[in-house]
Amino acid sequence: MGTVKITSRYGILLGFIALLCTIISTGIFFLTKDKIDAVIAAQQRELLLQVIPQDYFNNNLLESAVIPQDKNFVGIQKIYFAKKDGNISAYAYETTAPDGYSGDIRLLVGLDPKGEVLGVRVIEHHETPGLGDKIERRISNWILGFTNQSINEHNLSEWAVKKDGGKFDQFSGATITPRAVVNQTKRSALIMLNNQALLQQLSTQVK
């Protein structure tokens, strides 16, 4: 009988401790949530500024994003609309190259409405360290090769790695990774050029 009482007391005590830990954890979460959200937003803004220069827009890019549902935007997860005095001046696409050497490569591609690439950055990848990871800006300047490059119906063949007859460098021992990034950047630009009317409609959903 005494054993039952002791066990019961320990059970109540452990339950109380668990409840107290939950309350403390919840309190810490709510106290730090705003700070965490602010840090994430700052990182997102910094990344967007790497693909769309500040002088292109005076709206809030983070509040000007749309998740496209139309089948014409396959492979595009999100579109940020850069506006200058209410007029569209550029786009940033969150897009995914499905054919990296080690799987998906998530990209952020900045474009102006005429087909000029303003910048490209890698958001996430799983490519081989020392080979495919040269697509990262912190490791090499390769990704900067897209900046100010234009795409149109007359130069589509140039939008490939040199091994495939294009103008973009591949990496020694790693052609698949840069090929995937070049091809997805090209696809993103063509989606933008071929869907101007749809983009105008989508832009009405944001500030």
Curated annotation (Swiss-Prot):
EC number: 7.-.-.-
Positions bearing FMN phosphoryl threonine: 175
Any single Pfam family the record assigns to this protein: FMN_bind
GO cellular component, one term: plasma membrane
Keywords for this protein: Cell inner membrane, Cell membrane, Electron transport, Flavoprotein, FMN, Membrane, Phosphoprotein, Translocase, Transmembrane, Transmembrane helix, Transport
Record's subunit section: The complex is composed of six subunits: RnfA, RnfB, RnfC, RnfD, RnfE and RnfG.
Protein family (similarity comment): Belongs to the RnfG family.
Function as written in the Swiss-Prot or TrEMBL entry: Part of a membrane-bound complex that couples electron transfer with translocation of ions across the membrane.
Name of the protein in its database record: Ion-translocating oxidoreductase complex subunit G
